[in-house]
């Protein structure tokens, strides 16, 4: 991020330090207020809450306390295991699964798949990867139906859409 800021915005070390301090100040002053507002609003509208990029046990505990039932892209094996313990469904991106590596250096979806730690697959901005990802998950788990359910039934159920996601 330091390199990005210095190159993109021509910021020197002092300006970068001040920028980070300003961001920390904003987080300290507003993060919990905004987080509480989102929880209250989501609960009042019966909207599913999902966490994003949980990394540690602390992240997962905080997500569980907030009422999150879905973890979008846990970044470590530790976080994924704790999501399972806290009964938080785990969603990973199909591009990560198909490539076998995260584009940002996080846990590989294949590693999580091989440990049974993926419930739902998302396109992660590449819709054409969904079918290939579902088949790949089915092959890894030796259960093609499970792979297909990860892009149909399981996301629908996680979103509370009980009237879709399956063909009967």
Regions found by a protein language model. Give the residues of each.
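Acidic, glycine-rich loop-and-beta core segments that form the ion-binding/anion-interacting portion
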Residues: 57-71
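Active-site beta-loop-alpha junctions enriched in small/polar residues
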Residues: 1, 54-56, 76, 95-97, ...
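Hydrophobic faces of well-ordered beta-strands that scaffold small-molecule active sites
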Residues: 1, 49-51, 70-72, 90-93, ...
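Short acidic active-site motifs
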Residues: 58-59, 78-79, 107-108, 166
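His/Asp/Glu-enriched, well-ordered alpha-helical/loop segment
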Residues: 86-96, 100-168
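A general structural motif
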Residues: 29-33, 50-53, 71-80, 99-105
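Metal-coordinating catalytic core of metallo-dependent amide/deamination hydrolases
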Residues: 1-54, 65, 124
């Amino acid at each position: 991020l330091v390199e990005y800021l210095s190159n993109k915005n021509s910021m020197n070390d002092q300006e970068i330090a001040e920028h980070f301090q300003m961001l920390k100040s904003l987080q300290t002053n507003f993060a919990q207020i905004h987080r509480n507002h989102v929880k209250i609003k989501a609960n009042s509208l019966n909207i599913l809450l999902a966490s994003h990029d949980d990394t540690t046990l602390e992240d997962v505990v905080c997500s569980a306390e907030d009422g999150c039932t879905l973890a979008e892209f846990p970044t470590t094996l530790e976080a994924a295991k704790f999501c399972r313990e806290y009964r938080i469904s785990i969603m990973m991106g199909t591009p990560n699964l198909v490539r076998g590596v995260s584009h940002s250096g996080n846990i590989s979806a294949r590693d999580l798949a091989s440990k049974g730690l993926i419930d739902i697959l998302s396109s992660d901005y590449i819709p054409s990867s969904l079918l290939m990802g579902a088949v790949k998950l089915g092959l890894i788990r030796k259960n093609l139906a499970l792979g297909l359910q990860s892009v149909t039934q399981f996301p629908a159920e996680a979103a509370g859409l009980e009237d879709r996601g399956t063909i009967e």
